[in-house]
């Protein structure tokens, strides 16, 4: 193959690779990106779906904005159930990453004893699948000074009530 043909093939390959690359978009943090995986986890244990609440979204946005300065993994202390997530700088963490981390805690939850495995956390998972919860609202903020990403979801009614099973 001539050098000019090799160059043309290489350029065509580069153009096609660039055209098919996945580019992040705002749609990767839409309400549906929070709802779909949480509702899938709920359906897996026979619990009905949750719906999006703009009231909870606004609460989450306000608190996420407060965390943008330090990106500390600290709960709001608000009146709703709450799951929070922090992802380190250098990766464009999305809604699906936060929800996956919460749902992955299922492996540590023992329904029979209504407890987490020793030394493990599973309260984020139990909040996701809490039967009484009917609505959620979430927010995501990129923290200042390259400190990572903070993601929060609020739940109403709140879950994780002591002594009660989630479903």
Curated annotation (Swiss-Prot):
Residues 37-155 form the SCP domain. One of its GO terms (cellular component) is extracellular space. SMART domains: SCP (SM00198). It comes from Zea mays. PANTHER family: CYSTEINE-RICH SECRETORY PROTEIN-RELATED (PTHR10334). GO terms for biological process: defense response; sexual reproduction. It comes from the Eukaryota. Gene3D superfamilies: CAP (3.40.33.10). Belongs to the CRISP family. Disulfide bonds join 71-143, 116-122, 138-153. Keywords: Disulfide bond, Pathogenesis-related protein, Plant defense, Signal. This is Pathogenesis-related protein PRMS. Residues 1-27 form the signal peptide. Induction: By fungal infection in germinating seeds. Probably involved in the defense reaction of plants against pathogens.
């Amino acid at each position: 193959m001539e050098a000019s043909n090799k160059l043309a093939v290489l350029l065509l390959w580069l153009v096609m690779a660039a055209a098919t690359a996945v580019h992040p978009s705002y749609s990767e943090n839409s309400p549906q990106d929070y709802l779909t995986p949480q509702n899938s986890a709920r359906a897996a244990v026979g619990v009905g779906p949750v719906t999006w609440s703009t009231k909870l979204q606004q609460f989450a946005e306000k608190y996420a904005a407060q965390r943008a300065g330090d990106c500390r993994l600290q709960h709001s202390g608000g009146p709703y159930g709450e799951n929070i997530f922090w992802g380190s700088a250098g990766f464009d963490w999305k809604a699906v990453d936060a929800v996956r981390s919460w749902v992955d805690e299922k492996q540590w939850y023992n329904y029979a004893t209504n407890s987490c495995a020793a030394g493990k956390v599973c309260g984020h998972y139990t909040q996701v699948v809490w039967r009484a919860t009917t609505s959620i609202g979430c927010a995501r903020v990129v923290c200042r000074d390259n400190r990572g990403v903070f993601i929060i979801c609020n739940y109403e009614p709140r879950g994780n009530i002591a002594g009660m099973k989630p479903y």
